[in-house]
């Protein structure tokens, strides 16, 4: 009986370790009109979570339509575009559920948005906007970003960007 208790406890710790590891693991695929690829046949660049977390950290403190003011930390969209050698005028951000939104490249230049992976120092999970959440500096930019058009561009659960 004691052996079964030990075996079940060990199994529970093993499952918990797997769940914790997988909860933080994510990727971002960037495809379309890009110069640098990790998968030339697909013409795409696949970032692992380790690669993304190693990039310079940017932060935006802002409210969203779903949250009061929070500190978001993540990767600058401009940094991702530079890494892949993006050329185009439109970025299509896709979520895990295949929801997508088109964002003009001019937004990146004007607002310096981030793909956030943390909110108030806590890693985002799928149930709370993760793994990646496109965040604009809504509070700092004035009333223009507090509109239905820009609210629709705050896409969460991002896993893919296509450059057109």
What are these regions (language model features)?
Residues 9-20:
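Bacterial N-terminal signal peptides
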């Amino acid at each position: 009986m004691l052996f079964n208790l030990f075996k079940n406890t060990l199994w529970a710790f093993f499952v918990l370790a797997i769940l914790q590891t997988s909860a933080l693991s994510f990727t971002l695929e960037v495809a379309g009109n890009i110069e640098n690829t990790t998968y030339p046949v697909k013409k795409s660049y696949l970032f692992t979570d380790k690669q993304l977390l190693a990039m310079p950290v940017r932060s935006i403190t802002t409210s969203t339509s779903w949250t009061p003011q929070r500190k978001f930390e993540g990767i600058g969209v401009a940094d991702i575009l530079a890494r892949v050698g993006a050329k185009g005028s439109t970025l299509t951000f896709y979520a895990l559920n295949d929801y997508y939104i088109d964002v003009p490249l001019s937004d990146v230049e004007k607002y310096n948005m981030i793909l956030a992976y943390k909110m108030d120092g806590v890693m985002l999970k799928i149930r709370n906007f993760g793994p990646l959440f496109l965040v604009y500096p809504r509070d700092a930019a004035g009333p223009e970003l507090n509109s239905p058009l820009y609210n629709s561009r705050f896409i969460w659960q991002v896993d893919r960007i296509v450059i057109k």
